[in-house]
Regions:
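Aromatic- and glycine-rich beta-strand/loop motifs that create alpha-glucan
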Residues: 1-25, 160-162
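Junction motif at the cytosolic side of a transmembrane helix
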Residues: 6-15, 240-247, 312-333
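Secretory targeting signals
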Residues: 28, 32-50, 58, 95-138, ...
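Transmembrane helix segments
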Residues: 34-38, 251-281
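Membrane-proximal extracellular/periplasmic loop immediately following the first transmembrane helix
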Residues: 39-98
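Hydrophobic/aromatic residues in alpha-helical transmembrane segments
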Residues: 128-132, 145, 180, 240, ...
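Interfacial "coupling" helices/loops that link adjacent transmembrane helices in transporter permeases
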Residues: 141-159
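Short hydrophobic, aromatic-rich alpha-helical segments embedded in or entering the lipid bilayer
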Residues: 276-294
Length: 333
């Protein structure tokens, strides 16, 4: 099994897709870091110009942001779920001001978390799809599966070795994302920020903000928590991608199907949020990070435990289908 897994890892590396993914990550992280730094510098210049040359003060900007949020929260026409999400941000900003913690100045730790929060539902899953979509389908399209199955090795072992290799490469990819996001953003911001405290554990109960379970942790701990959730989501996406790769003999079709599912799922949760079955679709459960911040939930009845169980069910079902179909698939065609 070890030699089979090593062989599959070498196959993935020889395709040079990991190099392509790293290059894409480097470009996106650099652009986003530069954009955030540029926006921050512009805000400082704007503040100093409007205040008649008064030096930049993060507390003044935070207070201004706080006033804007309180004005929005007092709007009687917004949904109570949205108001609860705004109230959560108000509580956090008040805590930062009272404890002299700067929440505005960008740091590597803040960028790290923001990058995962924004990319966990589409961008990062697409990278996993690029990595894994042709894992099995390419063997069938190039007819190399016949050579692979001539060995005295059971089919399930061959597929298991591919899956183990995929898990290893997915784990490496998540690690690369963390390293690139940290180092590149630090080059722009010149601050790590991992020792800063952050309040987390907010949740929505029947549209109302519940802060009874909030805890104070460092940004380093919070970053580890965020990346743990990202790793779990990535493994689920990898499992589903493996299933599609087994079911479809063409790698381009596999990528197309998965891209359509990821993009289409984003539309489903906003335009068909009242349809009860939508919350069981894997795409609507990918954003696990929103449960840590108490963000607005577009679909009622969803929680962190619900999403983890739903995604786990999708992963297990995908593996069952993958092994069942692969063991019975006709390779003579």
């Amino acid at each position: 099994m070890i030699s089979l897994t090593q062989n599959e890892i070498i196959k993935i590396l020889l395709k040079k897709k990991m190099l392509l993914i790293v290059m894409l990550l480097l470009i996106f992280v650099s652009l986003l870091s530069y954009g955030q730094k540029y926006s921050y510098d512009n805000n400082i210049k704007k503040f100093e110009a409007e205040s008649g040359g008064v030096a930049y003060d993060w507390k003044a900007l935070t207070t201004q942001r706080l006033d804007d949020l309180e004005e929005r929260s007092n709007n009687e026409f917004i949904p109570k779920e949205v108001r609860a999400s705004i109230d959560r941000e108000i509580q956090q900003l008040n805590y930062f001001i009272e404890n002299d913690i700067n929440p505005i100045t960008p740091t590597a730790s803040k960028f790290n978390v923001q990058f995962v929060e924004q990319g966990i539902t589409l961008f990062i899953p697409l990278l996993i799809v690029i990595l894994a979509a042709d894992l099995v389908s390419n063997e069938f399209s190039k007819k190399t599966i016949k050579i692979l199955l001539t060995r005295a090795v059971p089919r399930w072992k061959i597929l298991l070795s591919k899956y183990i290799a995929l898990i290893i490469m997915t784990t490496i990819l998540v690690f690369i994302i963390a390293v690139l996001a940290t180092l590149v953003s630090y080059l722009f911001f010149q601050q790590w920020g991992f020792s800063e405290p952050i309040v987390t554990g907010f949740n929505l109960v029947e549209g109302e903000l519940n802060s009874n379970s909030t805890i104070l942790i460092s940004r380093f701990q919070y970053t580890l928590l965020i990346y743990s959730l990202l790793w779990f989501v990535s493994i689920v996406i990898a499992s589903i991608t493996l299933m599609i790769s087994v079911l479809v003999d063409n790698s381009s079709s596999a990528i197309g199907i998965l891209m359509a599912a990821l993009i289409g799922g984003q539309f489903l949760q906003f335009f068909l949020s009242e349809w009860k079955l939508v919350k069981y679709f894997f795409v609507t459960n990918l954003d696990l990070t929103r449960y840590l911040t108490g963000s607005y939930q577009p679909i009622e009845g969803m929680s962190l435990n619900f999403s983890i169980l739903t995604l786990s069910a999708w992963a297990v079902l995908s593996l069952v289908i993958s092994f069942t179909v692969f063991n019975r698939k006709d390779v003579l065609v």
